[in-house]
Swiss-Prot record:
Signal peptide: none annotated. Its EC number is 2.7.7.4. It is an enzyme of class 2 (transferase). Pathway: Sulfur metabolism; hydrogen sulfide biosynthesis; sulfite from sulfate: step 1/3. It comes from Pyropia yezoensis. Optimum pH is 8.2. This is Sulfate adenylyltransferase. Optimum temperature is 37 degrees Celsius.
Length: 420
């Protein structure tokens, strides 16, 4: 029998604020929504951000800053990054509590309406301190907000038209309704998701394999395990590899049958009568990155719970981006430890994974904590980018050739365009 995680916030079904049509908006005040917030509003509308029915009210916003949670029916539910809608001071002045406003895309199309709860000023220093845990602002996460000229926030409830996804990998993106239906259809007794914003090298890939095998050992005698490579394909910082290229690498990895090759425990899977390659699916999640470390790890878990996933993998430096001087904002495993400190309810279970590397003595990837004293094969991130950028194939013990080839083609095209 399928086991699907309950919707966050105590709801029986994911929030659904998608409508077929909108009333006339010609006379309504307008809120221009940038591409990033457009995506967030659609994730609210499709239930990925349940129990929200719109951008956060001031009461919810303040609750997240103070308690790392939102209250529903007298109960606190885990939530670590406030999600109100940024607006300009001029837009805020035109909004009235209890009345609708039109949501307008950057291209000028009205895509939804917001019934206003209230507009309020945006205390960015307080926001940054609560989310990132530091008053320093020399890091990518802080710049997301400090570079935004908007000074106010608004909360309320939304109704939006369905988004017409046009990217080439649109069939590989799953939303709460479709993912939950898939989990039930496949009869997964447990499921595990791995979050990434990067192309995978084998140590990354092993985190997914490890999480799947840990779950398999726990429930594999009685339950079929669903395994999901669940990358974010929303807005990222400029030096991250674009979503289309990353998705191509993931497709090569999974459709090519390379997942876990040489690193998985073949005997374990065989003994449970299950198959990692057949049970692993690629499911993109169209949501932005906040580069928020531990705070974002909790949000990532909430997204997956709303998708219906039962277990979520948390590795080292989850959602991490250091200070500009390369010093660390958070400890390597702070994103794992935050789940032990949450006061709000969160039903999805986490699977913690430590450092992994290819070990010469083993002939495959394993956990560093279990293989102390053995010889690792590794390439630094900067060296890896340098090799791929120059068209040099990295060591296959570090990155699979199918993944590397996609990236080398990407950098070659990028370099050619830059010199044209």
């Amino acid at each position: 029998m399928a086991n699907v995680s309950p919707v966050h916030g105590g709801l029986s079904e994911p929030v659904n604020r998608v409508v077929d049509s909108l009333p006339s908006t010609e006379l309504l005040p307008k809120i221009v929504v940038n591409a990033t917030d457009y995506t967030t509003l659609h994730r609210i509308a499709d239930g990925t951000l349940s129990p929200l029915t719109g951008p956060m009210t001031k009461a919810d916003y303040d609750s997240v800053l103070l308690k790392k949670g939102i209250e529903r029916d007298g109960k606190l539910w885990a939530w670590t990054i406030p999600l109100s809608l940024p607006v300009t001071a001029e837009e805020a002045k035109a909004l009235k509590a209890g009345e609708p406003a039109a949501l307008v895309s950057e291209s000028g199309d009205v895509f939804g309406t917001l019934t206003v709860d209230a507009a309020f000023s945006w205390d960015k220093p307080a926001f940054l301190k609560a989310v990132y845990g530091t008053e320093r602002t020399d890091h990518p996460g802080a710049r997301l907000w400090l570079d935004d000229p908007r000074t106010d926030l608004v909360g309320g409830s939304i109704s939006v038209l369905a988004h017409d996804e046009a990217r080439p990998f649109k069939d590989r993106i799953l939303y709460p309704q479709s993912m939950r239906a898939l989990l039930k259809e496949q009869g997964y007794g447990a499921s595990v998701a791995f979050q990434t914003r990067n192309p995978l090298h084998r140590a990354h890939e092993y985190a997914l394999v490890y999480g799947a095998e840990k779950l398999l050992k726990e429930v594999g005698d009685s339950s079929k395990v669903g395994v999901f490579l669940n990358p974010l394909v929303g807005q990222l910082k400029g030096d991250d590899v674009p979503a289309a290229t990353r998705m191509e690498t993931y497709i090569k990895l999974i459709d090519g049958g390379f997942i876990g090759e040489g690193d998985m425990d073949e005997e374990l899977w065989k003994s449970k009568g299950q198959n990692l390659r057949e049970q692993t699916r690629l499911a993109g999640l169209d949501m932005r990155m906040f580069y928020g470390g531990p705070s974002e790890a909790v949000m990532h878990a909430i997204y997956r719970q709303n998708l219906g996933i039962t277990h979520f993998i948390i590795g080292r430096k989850h959602a991490d981006a250091p200070f500009d001087d390369k010093s660390a904002i958070w400890g390597d495993f702070d994103a794992q430890e935050i789940f032990e400190k949450l006061e709000g309810d969160l039903q999805i279970k986490t699977v913690n994974v430590g450092f992994a590397a290819y070990f010469e003595e083993l002939g495959h990837v394993g956990l560093c904590s279990e293989n102390k004293g053995k010889t690792t094969v590794s390439i630094s991130g900067s060296k890896m980018r340098e090799m791929l950028n120059s068209g040099s194939m990295p060591d296959s013990r570090v990155m699979r050739p199918a993944t590397a080839q996609v990236l080398m083609d990407y950098y070659a095209a990028k370099n050619k365009s830059a010199t044209a």
